[in-house]
């Protein structure tokens, strides 16, 4: 599943590069869109199943910086599901070039 995100000025630091922590927000949007695409929202999962998602572990390799006004593509894939865990693999690209 892919999500497109435009980098806004608020996402950047003084050099107009995406501030490193903001990539986590972009990845969260990708996971949320993944669930929406399956017909779920965080609110209906909590109401119906009485649970919510927490991020226990996250590893990021910063390969190349993104800049103000870039259009990024976040790809989200589920790689493993158990009764209590979902493992996602995500990456961020611009024009098919890997950034994160």
Feature map (PLM): residue ranges:
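HotDog/MaoC-like acyl-thioester-processing domains
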Residues: 1-3, 36, 66-71, 79-100
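Acidic side chains
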Residues: 11-13, 61, 70
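Short, structured secondary-structure boundary patches
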Residues: 23, 64-66
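Short, intrinsically disordered/low-complexity patches at protein termini
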Residues: 42-44, 59-60, 92, 97
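Short structured motifs
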Residues: 57-62, 74-75
């Amino acid at each position: 599943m892919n999500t497109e995100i435009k980098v806004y000025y608020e996402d950047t630091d003084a050099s107009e590069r995406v501030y490193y922590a903001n990539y986590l927000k972009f990845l969260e949007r990708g996971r949320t869109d993944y669930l929406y695409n399956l017909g779920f929202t965080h609110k209906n999962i909590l109401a119906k199943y009485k649970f919510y998602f927490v991020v226990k572990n996250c590893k990021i390799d910063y390969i190349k910086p993104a800049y103000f006004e870039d259009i990024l593509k976040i790809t989200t894939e589920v790689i493993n599901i158990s009764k209590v865990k979902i493992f996602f693999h995500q990456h961020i690209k611009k024009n098919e070039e890997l950034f994160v």
